[in-house]
Structures are given as structure tokens and as C-alpha cells.
A protein has these predicted regions:
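Carbohydrate-active catalytic/glycan-binding domains of CAZyme proteins
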Residues: 1-337
Length: 337
């Protein structure tokens, strides 16, 4: 059993699974490399806003007063984003729709909104990807992505009740989505990771750009790809000490690295370890094994316990009544295999 003291750092990952209709999922880690799902892998919050009622790409930011603010993609083709807040990541406020692109009747979408709190100005930046036909420098597209040419837009707020006018945030010479910002604690500048979304020829890779101050914007001259010859998206940058980790979705392979199975685009963020401990300890919201597990049998091999059973839940296996395997080192924290 790990003893954790107040003031120590732990890490949370907000994410969605499958089609995102079941809502917000959380995972935790103490080192940024080994992650376990909370709440037995079940959702903490079911989406209730937007025409499709999705909760894709949940981005969470903790305010100086301890409140957690979250924004998310509510639809594939909507001009709003979802918003809710919480003091404990378990009980959430009424969900709201922020009409960030309602003033643009031709806007196709509002994808992957992200939150960043700028300490010097005590201001929250919310930024996302939108296509507005004819608005941006044209790029060649594949037939399947015809008409999609994204740029990053943003609004600011101090209270999540009033918002600035929507403005352009990042306008490179390529279609761009999935922007995510993290502060470098050593250099004290800001790093933004973005996806080059060009489809003809396909790029589908992650690039980096840096700035000293967010209000001055980010250079549109970006780095060479930091990912390999596979399609990547959904970057989630996180500093663990002086080391920068960038988690991302190898979406054609249907996997993230070093995180729970089935995870999709979200945000990694640091919290006081006591917050993670309270989430783990709350058995009302974190059962050892999710509901609907039948005929359990446990065996131990080496230092690992394996629990075998059948389930009616869909873990991406495609059918009910499928045999499943969970494993644990301590008989308390179980991960799905």
C-alpha cells in the first residue's frame, strides 16, 4: 500500500472511451508512466448538452481556488462546446453549452476544446479547432475529408460566465487540430503541441511550437514531426518533474501508450496526491470491479492476481457474455486486460 502525504504530486488523465456517449472517465498515476482507471473504469458524468450529446476530448483545468473546470466536444457538427465544474471531480455542476461559434453560421464544427490557465493574467484560455469554408488558406484534401480545413480559435474568461469575443488563435499554412498547451517549469515558456491534419498527402502527425507569453500567440513555424510514420492525434502533454511526456492516440491502431485500454483523447494534469487518494478511497464511485461481472475466479501467478469472469458490459469486445480477465498486484486496484 502506498502512503501519500498532502503536498505530494499525483496525476490524473481525463478521457473518453468508445463513442463517448457514456461520458467522463478518469485514470490516475504517481509517476506519469503507469496509469490505472478510477471508478472501476466507469463514467463519472454523462453528457447532456449538444445535439449529439457526446463527451469527447474532455479537458480539465484546476483553478487556484481548487475548482475543476472542464470543457469537451459535444458533437461532430456543432457550434458549441460543453462546460461543467466540480470541487471533487465526482459531483458536477449543471452542464452548459458555451456558444463559441454560434456567430459563424457556416462553421462546421468545434473540436477538441482545451483549457489553459494563464497565471500572470489570471485568465482562462479556451481554444478549439473549427472549419469555416473559404476562410483559411486552402489545402489539398483527400476525398473523405473534402471541405475540412481547420484552424484554432479561442475565447478567454475569468469566471466561466462571461467570455471574450471569439478570435483566431493559431493560423498556420496547414489544417490543424488538437492543440494542447503546457508550461515548461524549467524554461518558463509555453509549449503547444498540435496535429497537422493535412490529408493529401497525409501528414497526420504531431508538431511543436513555443512562446514566452500566450497573449503574444505561438509561431506558426512549427517543429518537424515528433511522431513516427503512423497516424497520431489527441496529444496530452504533461511535465513530471523536468521530463515532458506527450501522450497521444495512435488512432489507427486503437491505442494510447502507458494508459488504460480503450482510452481516447483527453488531458493529463497534476494534482495534489490527496485528491487521487480520495477518489481511490470512495468505494461508492470506485468499486473494485465494475458491475455485471459474473462467475468470478481468482488465481495468482508470481506477484500478480488474475480475476476471471464473464461480463455483460462492452469493453470493446463486441458482444455480451464474453470471458474477461482483470489483474492486480494488491487485490485493491484492478486493471482490465
Amino acid at each position: 500500500v502506498m502512503t501519500v502525504f498532502a503536498g505530494e504530486t499525483a496525476y490524473l488523465f481525463s478521457y473518453f472511451i468508445n463513442d463517448s456517449k457514456d461520458g467522463l472517465h478518469l485514470a490516475y498515476s504517481y509517476d506519469g508512466l503507469n496509469w490505472l482507471p478510477l471508478h472501476g473504469g466507469r463514467s463519472y458524468l454523462t453528457p447532456a448538452v449538444g445535439k449529439d450529446k457526446l463527451m469527447r476530448d474532455p479537458s480539465i483545468c484546476q483553478s487556484p481556488d481548487g475548482t475543476f473546470h472542464m470543457v469537451w466536444t459535444s458533437s461532430w457538427t456543432d457550434r458549441i462546446i460543453g462546460y461543467a465544474s466540480s470541487r471533487d471531480l465526482v459531483h458536477w455542476s449543471e452542464q452548459q453549452a458555451i456558444p463559441v461559434m454560434m456567430h459563424e453560421p457556416d462553421a462546421h464544427n468545434c473540436w477538441a476544446p482545451e483549457l489553459f490557465y494563464d497565471e500572470p493574467s489570471q485568465t482562462y484560455y479556451i481554444f478549439w479547432a473549427t472549419t469555416i469554408p473559404g476562410r483559411h488558406k486552402e489545402v489539398a484534401t483527400s476525398e473523405s475529408e473534402k471541405g475540412l480545413n481547420h484552424r484554432i480559435y479561442y475565447v478567454t474568461t475569468k469566471d466561466f460566465r462571461t467570455f471574450s469575443k471569439t478570435k483566431m488563435f493559431f493560423n498556420p499554412d496547414f489544417s490543424v487540430i488538437d492543440a494542447a498547451i503546457v508550461k515548461d517549469p524549467k524554461r518558463e515558456d509555453l509549449i503547444m503541441v498540435v496535429k497537422n491534419e493535412n490529408s493529401n498527402p497525409p501528414e497526420k502527425n504531431l508538431r511543436v511550437t513555443r512562446t514566452k507569453k500566450i497573449e503574444k500567440g505561438f509561431p506558426t513555424k512549427v517543429s518537424a514531426p515528433i511522431t513516427g510514420k503512423y497516424w497520431a492525434e489527441g496529444p496530452a502533454p504533461l511535465f513530471v518533474g523536468d521530463t515532458l511526456y506527450v501522450y497521444f492516440d495512435k488512432y489507427r491502431d486503437h491505442r494510447y501508450g502507458a494508459v488504460p485500454r480503450g482510452i481516447r483523447h483527453g488531458t493529463a494534469f497534476a494534482v495534489d496526491a490527496s485528491i487521487v487518494e480520495s477518489l481511490i478511497a470512495d468505494r461508492n464511485y470506485n468499486p473494485l470491479i465494475p458491475d455485471n461481472l459474473a462467475d468470478p475466479s481468482v488465481s495468482k501467478f508470481g506477484d500478480t492476481y488474475y480475476l476471471y469472469g464473464t461480463t455483460d458490459l462492452d469493453y470493446g469486445l463486441g458482444r455480451a457474455g464474453t470471458p474477461v480477465v482483470w489483474k492486480s498486484k494488491d487485490f485493491v486496484n484492478w486493471s482490465f486486460e
